Amino acid sequence: VEAFLGSWKLQKSHNFDEYMKNLDVSLAQRKVATTVKPKTIISLDGDVITIKTESTFKSTNIQFKLAEEFDETTADNRTTKTTVKLENGKLVQTQRWDGKETTLVRELQDGKLILTCTMGDVVCTREYVREQ
């Protein structure tokens, strides 16, 4: 987990609007969300991980222990049962709600944080660079 710690700024995004459509995010929310460049801050206190996402649109904050299910309220106001696991050096976050499921995988590639979001057959990638 230590390699993920720090502050990350969104640099580029691919297929985010399609991904949000699959989540049933409203057109107005999608328009705003695709224009902002959020910052993600990942920290660790003992065995509790915090992932804070900050933007001018909406900020979220989740705290969890690896492999323990918790209740999450997402940026688009879904209430999910969420689990985060460390698998092959990747942080794999699974959100479940209303019989649906989406997966958010965070991994490090060439010093960048790559977030791959999958919902059904739609895959979105978001690339973050470490802030100094």
Swiss-Prot record:
GO CC terms of this entry: cytoplasm
Annotated compartments: Cytoplasm
SUPFAM superfamilies the UniProt entry points to: Lipocalins
Modified residues (N-acetylvaline): V1
Positions of modified residues (Phosphotyrosine): Y19
Protein keywords: Acetylation, Cytoplasm, Lipid-binding, Phosphoprotein, Transport
A single GO molecular function term of this UniProt record: lipid binding
Any coiled-coil regions, as ranges: none
Pfam family, one: Lipocalin
Keyword match Metal-binding: no
Domain-level remarks: Forms a beta-barrel structure that accommodates hydrophobic ligands in its interior.
Biological function: FABPs are thought to play a role in the intracellular transport of long-chain fatty acids and their acyl-CoA esters.
Family according to the record: Belongs to the calycin superfamily. Fatty-acid binding protein (FABP) family.
Name of protein: Fatty acid-binding protein, liver
Organism: Ginglymostoma cirratum (Nurse shark)
